[in-house]
Amino acid sequence: METVTSSDSSSAVENEHPQDTPESNNSVYTSFMKSHRCYDLIPTSSKLVVFDTSLQVKKAFFALVTNGVRAAPLWDSKKQSFVGMLTITDFINILHRYYKSALVQIYELEEHKIETWREVYLQDSFKPLVCISPNASLFDAVSSLIRNKIHRLPVIDPESGNTLYILTHKRILKFLKLFITEFPKPEFMSKSLEELQIGTYANIAMVRTTTPVYVALGIFVQHRVSALPVVDEKGRVVDIYSKFDVINLAAEKTYNNLDVSVTKALQHRSHYFEGVLKCYLHETLETIINRLVEAEVHRLVVVDENDVVKGIVSLSDILQALVLTGGEKP
């Protein structure tokens, strides 16, 4: 199997309940992650969808929607191994690459198999599947997610070769939050976003309410971000267009007209949309984490007192600060 696995930390299970002195509280979450394995996070039952690479791309995306999942491991029958992941990013890349106009059907989406798309997309730049063993530490998992700039990490049993679970930033942070009250609170948890400088505050990728979906897809491809704040003419955030919203084009079979505005494309969820989840630079890291976990979102939009966008704080930023850098800016 051509895969990249993260090596087990030598300290993976040395200490189930690390005893930190007050001076070393800043590393308490790092110690926790090093003392728990990926296996500890796997629920007793969860849905996992696997696609064979010979499946048609269109059917695969409809299956993602039907099953309510955002990604699926890809099984290559010829190689008898998992070779990659199919995600909403692939759907975006296909639409952006092949869309011509509302009058022309996207042949490649209708007819291509997953293996054909992978050959076109990867070409000569072969990327091995990044995965992890269930015995590896959660610290290794966080490191792998951030180092490889990925959002999903398959947990694959090295003996059977079976995919057991898919780890995400969201699931790891939720797991950490379950135990967070048992630890002495690190000093940095009471510091503000501004003090810690966590997040992205330069070259924020955004769209206007009138921006066509096709243009938004191009921004996703170019900037490699997972969401775009939607702003009015004064730069105030009024909505957010995420990669997950794009899969609705498949759900409603409206992917043949990408000239509509993001505002129109977002109308499908207006009946339950509670508004953009925001935060301020003066708010503490503890407040930010609580908001992210409780709302089960992947990022918060940082705004000023007028709701003008100042930055984005993602789950990746949070985990990097908590686990890899002990609250300090990397």
Curated annotation (Swiss-Prot):
GO cellular component, one term: cytoplasm
This protein's record includes keyword DNA damage: no
PTMs per UniProt: Phosphorylated by ULK1 and ULK2; leading to negatively regulate AMPK activity and suggesting the existence of a regulatory feedback loop between ULK1, ULK2 and AMPK. Glycosylated; O-GlcNAcylated by OGT, promoting the AMP-activated protein kinase (AMPK) activity.
This protein's record includes keyword Repressor: no
Residues binding ADP 2: 70, 170, 242-245, 269, 277, 298-299
Residues involved in AMP 2 binding: 70, 170, 242-245, 269, 277, 298-299
Signal peptide annotation: none
Classification via PROSITE patterns: CBS (PS51371)
Residue ranges that the Swiss-Prot or TrEMBL entry lists as coiled coil: none
Modified residues (Phosphothreonine): 263
Residues of the CBS domain: 43-103, 125-187, 198-260, 272-329
Pfam families, alphabetized: CBS
Sample GO molecular function, one term: ATP binding
Family listed: Belongs to the 5'-AMP-activated protein kinase gamma subunit family.
Subunit structure: AMPK is a heterotrimer of an alpha catalytic subunit (PRKAA1 or PRKAA2), a beta (PRKAB1 or PRKAB2) and a gamma non-catalytic subunits (PRKAG1, PRKAG2 or PRKAG3). Interacts with FNIP1 and FNIP2.
Domain notes: The AMPK pseudosubstrate motif resembles the sequence around sites phosphorylated on target proteins of AMPK, except the presence of a non-phosphorylatable residue in place of Ser. In the absence of AMP this pseudosubstrate sequence may bind to the active site groove on the alpha subunit (PRKAA1 or PRKAA2), preventing phosphorylation by the upstream activating kinase STK11/LKB1.
Role: AMP/ATP-binding subunit of AMP-activated protein kinase (AMPK), an energy sensor protein kinase that plays a key role in regulating cellular energy metabolism. In response to reduction of intracellular ATP levels, AMPK activates energy-producing pathways and inhibits energy-consuming processes: inhibits protein, carbohydrate and lipid biosynthesis, as well as cell growth and proliferation. AMPK acts via direct phosphorylation of metabolic enzymes, and by longer-term effects via phosphorylation of transcription regulators.
Protein name per UniProt: 5'-AMP-activated protein kinase subunit gamma-1
Organism, as annotated: Sus scrofa
